[in-house]
């Protein structure tokens, strides 16, 4: 049985948690991984080699003086708790076992035509547009899976399922 579920405040709570948490933890955790793995590459070298235009414009500013302060990260972690509460409330009120939605709102774009994309008549950043459906559940740390769902205009599409916290 399919039930429409409302998630009021989801996008706002996710916006407050998403990039601050992901970017802070990327710098902290990737630096530690590269050091422990002894691969002979630094985080600065890795970042310098990023080729995707939408990511290359984002990551270098996180190093050195552009590093995110711990206080911003802690504020984002508080927003993450609001995000988790929104999901918990939605699952409790609706009684559903999973939320079902398209993995992405668009199919892939050709390399070179993908720095920005258009969705519903609005042009926006590629990265944010493609993660908008899966980002909130990921940030809330709820279990999720994406399954192949066929092709659209010859390109693969997926259907995603997110479950309540602890249901994995």
Residue ranges and their predicted role:
Residues 1-39:
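Gly/Ser-rich, acidic/histidine-flanked active-site/gating loops
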Residues 2-6, 40-44, 98, 145:
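Acidic/polar loop patches that form or flank catalytic/metal-binding clefts of enzymes
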Residues 19-21, 27, 54-62, 112-116, ...:
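Short alpha-helical interface elements
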Residues 24-85, 106, 148-156:
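Short helix-loop capping/hinge segments that flank enzyme active sites or metal/cofactor-binding pockets
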Residues 67-168:
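Glycine-rich, small-residue loops and helix-cap segments
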Residues 1, 12-16, 53-57, 99-104, ...:
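Short, functional N-terminal and low-complexity linear motifs
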């Amino acid at each position: 049985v399919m039930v429409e579920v409302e998630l009021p405040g989801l996008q706002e709570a996710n916006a407050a948690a998403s990039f601050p948490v992901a970017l802070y933890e990327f710098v902290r955790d990737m630096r530690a991984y590269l050091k422990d793995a002894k691969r002979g590459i630094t985080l600065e070298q890795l970042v310098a080699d990023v080729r995707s235009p939408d990511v290359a414009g984002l990551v270098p500013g996180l190093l050195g003086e552009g590093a995110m302060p711990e206080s911003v990260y802690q504020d984002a972690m508080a927003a993450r708790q609001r995000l988790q509460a929104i999901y918990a409330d939605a699952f409790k009120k609706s009684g559903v076992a999973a939320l079902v939605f398209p993995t992405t709102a668009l199919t892939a774009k050709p390399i070179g035509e993908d720095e920005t994309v258009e969705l519903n008549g609005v042009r926006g950043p590629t990265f944010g547009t493609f993660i908008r459906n899966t980002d909130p559940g990921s940030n809330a740390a709820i279990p999720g899976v994406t399954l192949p769902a066929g092709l659209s205009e010859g390109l693969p599409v997926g259907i995603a399922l997110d479950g309540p916290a602890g249901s994995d």
